[in-house]
From Swiss-Prot:
Primary residence: membrane
Binding site residues for substrate: 449, 454, 458
Gene (name only): dgcQ
Pathway(s) the chain acts in: Glycan metabolism; bacterial cellulose biosynthesis; Purine metabolism; 3',5'-cyclic di-GMP biosynthesis
Function: Catalyzes the synthesis of cyclic-di-GMP (c-di-GMP) via the condensation of 2 GTP molecules. Cyclic-di-GMP is a second messenger which controls cell surface-associated traits in bacteria. Involved in the regulation of cellulose production.
Highest rank taxon of the organism: Bacteria
Name the record gives this protein: Probable diguanylate cyclase DgcQ
Residue span, GGDEF domain: 433-568
Length: 569
């Protein structure tokens, strides 16, 4: 309890210090300080304009980049969603294959041709895609390949079902050039037809040696998540670069194969060009996760990379800490944003010459005129505002003091005391601190008024108020709530501590005689009632005051000039 009291007293002292500081720094000083700050900042006008313009410029660059990145991301997300849909369909077909005669015949046909060097199973060329495969002997030569699974027949029928879905999902408006399912059991289904059966082994081994297939082994892809891979063409090769999104197909902890979709870089380049506002400057570049250049929106530099190794290193360092951002490189501003559904980053490059031709010159002039107008108005109005604020503050302070205080005793009046007490009670309740109330009533005050007059009574009230105030702690609050009644609020004080304060008040009032007329002195006394929230857990100020008032009258009935802190004391 001692620690709680110390903490509470420290908090009260801090609040008192803040109030003193607020009184010392009156509105007049604050107005002067504001104008001084304005004058100081006027010397930094040019710098401030640069900062404002730079923030607006960076926001503009990021917004343009975000629009293009979102458009590209949505298109890529559509392809990823299709891939997940195909995987779910494949899993369902592996667990519960359709019991069609044509599918059973396909399994029989596989058993008949599985030893052949190359084979092809086709149900209906118009509705589904053929399954192309190689022999058992060729499968046994691959480290990742195997036909040793109990659900091989189900996988054959599932591949035919997925072939039907692949044909439906593949369309010319999509960026995807090829969608394929490659099985570890030596066969594949692809939207790109294999015209000659003799080409099946070459094409199959081309698939299973690709990073997008090998990278989905259970060791390489433990989380069995979607992955993106980039393939760069070799020198003297006619193939074009492309990115492949792929996902493993597993069932019952067995890896069956990989579903993949290949997107040529040229289609992504065309998409970037179509997504960009023709009225905007700047070049967009797409990079993979290793910051290898893929494509650009600039038709004049379709395969160029405008960053040297040092700049790429700076860009990579900046990307380590956030998913989006910007960096200034010489006369260029480079903004970047990682894509959600592609393992790569979209970069926007804006040069200084492009920025000069933009709208920021007009913005600079507008900001300058606005600042000049605002400063002129401040300087012209300063004197009038300063005088008005000073006069209003003096008047407000006087009216506020009169509204909150009793002019005779200079203590809080009843309304102000209640306004102060309720928030303090709520604060003590919140922090589980005790909250106590002392009710004070001067004994035989009416007799003093009747015998010595109202002026003497006023002097007694003023004298008693001074003694009560001098008996309190710094955080305590006292107020006059009636004719000769006073109320003291003690936040953080328990019943015992409040009773000690009440006894101190009683002794001070009773031990000093006061002069009320020429050669006439009297000794006054008071009856006091004490209540505390720790008795019943009730922090309602009015209830506590009522309880203290009841105990006050118990003290009067017991003979006056005493303190009652309980109903039995």
């Amino acid at each position: 309890m001692g620690v709680v009291r110390v903490q509470h007293e420290t908090k009260m002292e801090n609040q008192s210090w803040l109030k003193k500081l607020a009184r010392r720094l009156g509105p007049g000083h604050i107005v002067n300080l504001c104008f001084i700050v304005v004058l100081l900042f006027s010397t930094l006008l040019t710098w401030r304009e640069v900062v404002v313009l730079e923030d607006a410029y960076i926001s503009s660059q990021r917004n343009h980049l975000e629009n293009v990145a979102n458009a590209l991301d949505k298109h890529l997300q559509y392809n990823v969603d299709k891939l997940i849909f195909l995987r779910n369909g494949m899993r369902e077909a592996l667990v519960a294959p359709l019991d069609f005669t044509s599918l059973r015949n396909a399994v029989t046909e596989f058993e008949q041709h599985r030893d052949e060097h190359a084979w092809q199973i086709e149900l209906n060329r118009r509705r589904t895609l053929p399954v192309n495969g190689v022999s058992d002997a060729l499968v046994s030569e691959g480290n990742l390949l195997s036909r040793e699974n109990e659900s091989l027949d189900n996988e054959i029928t599932a591949a035919l079902e997925v072939g039907y879905l692949l044909r439906l999902a593949h369309n010319s408006s999509s960026m995807v050039e090829q969608a394929v399912y490659v099985s570890r059991a030596g066969f594949y289904v692809s939207t790109l037809p294999t015209l000659f059966t003799r080409n099946v082994p070459t094409r199959y081994y081309g698939y299973v040696t690709q990073p997008w297939f090998i990278g989905h082994s259970q060791r390489e892809n433990r989380h069995r998540a979607v992955r993106w891979f980039t393939s760069q063409p070799e020198h003297a090769s006619n193939t074009e670069p492309q990115v492949t999104v792929s996902v493993p197909v597993d069932s019952n902890n067995y890896w069956y194969g990989v579903l993949g979709m290949s997107i040529p870089v040229r289609t992504m380049q065309q998409f970037l060009r179509n997504a960009i506002d023709k009225n905007l400057d700047g070049e967009y570049q797409l990079y993979d996760s290793k910051l290898r250049f893929l494509t650009s929106s600039n038709p004049d530099h379709p395969t160029g990379n405008i960053f040297d190794p040092r700049e790429l290193a700076l860009l990579a360092q900046a990307m380590e800490h956030d998913t989006r951002g910007g960096i200034r490189m010489d006369s260029r501003y480079v903004s970047w944003e990682r894509l959600d559904h592609f393992d790569g980053v979209l970069v926007r490059v804006h040069t200084l010459s492009e920025g000069v031709r933009g709208d920021f010159g007009s913005i600079s002039i507008a900001l300058t005129l606005l600042w000049a107008l605002f400063t002129s108005m401040l300087l012209l109005s300063w004197y009038v505002i300063r005088r008005m604020v000073s006069n209003m503050y003096v008047l407000q302070s006087s009216l506020q003091w009169q509204a909150w205080h009793d002019t005779l005793t200079r203590l809080y009046n009843r309304g102000a005391l209640f306004e102060k007490a309720c928030p303090l009670a709520k604060l003590c309740h919140t922090h589980q601190h005790p909250f106590s109330v002392i009710q004070v009533d001067l004994d035989h005050f009416k007799a003093i008024n009747d015998r010595f007059g109202h002026q003497a009574g006023d002097r007694v009230l003023s004298h008693a108020a001074g003694l009560i105030s001098s008996s309190l702690r710094a955080q305590d609050i006292a107020g006059r709530v009636g004719g000769e009644e006073f109320c003291v609020i003690l936040p953080g004080a328990n019943l015992t501590q409040a009773a000690e304060v009440a006894e101190r008040i009683r002794l001070k009032l009773n031990e000093k005689e006061m002069l009320i007329a020429k050669s006439t002195t009297i000794r006054i006394s008071a009856s006091l009632g004490v209540s505390s929230s720790e008795e019943t857990g009730d922090y309602d100020f009015e209830q506590l005051q009522s309880l203290a008032d009841r105990r006050l009258y118990l003290a009067k009935q017991a003979g006056r000039n005493r303190v009652f802190a309980s109903d039995n004391a």
